[in-house]
């Protein structure tokens, strides 16, 4: 099986036992190169596309998917992102999806809402698989009741107005009897909005700078984690919070609430419009609820095994149906 990308926490988590992953971690994937694909078509039973194709033109994606068909290599697609946050138009992203979903043997996604959208927009039935566990709670690390965390960093199209988000989150944390901690990855500290440093200096909020490897630990220390991405189909951070026992406040745009019942939504659409009053209220509502317990490891392990079994059955099905071009 050739996975695109070759390695990723999600791709690793869903890989079934006994399935060999071939290729390397080159970016963009060598499997997008027609010559490489033709030379190695007989070495692979299935190509599984997750992400990593945004840098290609839509016409190139269409030509690539047609080349897979000519070579007789089945394509499996997991749809991770149905929208393109921060882009002025979703046309390019939609065209990419249309190109690969039109030729995929099997389509998967991670929430019922996303599957409904895929059916409506692209006429494909998607198999819904749960997002498997991606973190393990540290038994030595406690959480602070009332502590609200919001990740901030370099300017991003997916978070067009971070100052509005921070001020609304601060209002929600304080009105709910808590406090706000801004989480800043080390690599993004130089690009941090100066206003946030000033707010920390005056004691309005706390800044916590962390290395990327400690992200799950940072989330575990919170009562509430606020997700700031503009409009996601689903979120890995929701699953990390489920694993470590942190309540989530997430945008209403997308299907975050489909992932976990502990998600509290706030109004935020794919065009970057965030309702500050809604965010403040959502944080207050989340703080009024008890902190969830970390996910039961036996249940999460069983869920992961079931997800891997679905992938194993899909791979076996499409490989068995394969006919050489």
What do the predicted segments below correspond to?
Residues 145-204:
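Conserved catalytic-core segment of nucleotide-activated headgroup transferases in glycan assembly
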Residues 217-233, 243-246:
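Acidic donor-binding loop of glycosyltransferase active sites
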Residues 30, 36-59, 76-78, 226-228:
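Short N-terminal targeting/anchoring amphipathic segment
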Residues 270-278, 284-325:
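A charged, aromatic-enriched C-terminal amphipathic alpha-helix characteristic of glycosyltransferases
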Residues 53-56, 74-90, 106:
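A short, histidine- and acid-enriched strand-loop-helix "catalytic/donor-clamping" loop
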Residues 63-74, 90-106:
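Membrane-proximal helix-turn-helix segments that form the acceptor-binding/catalytic region
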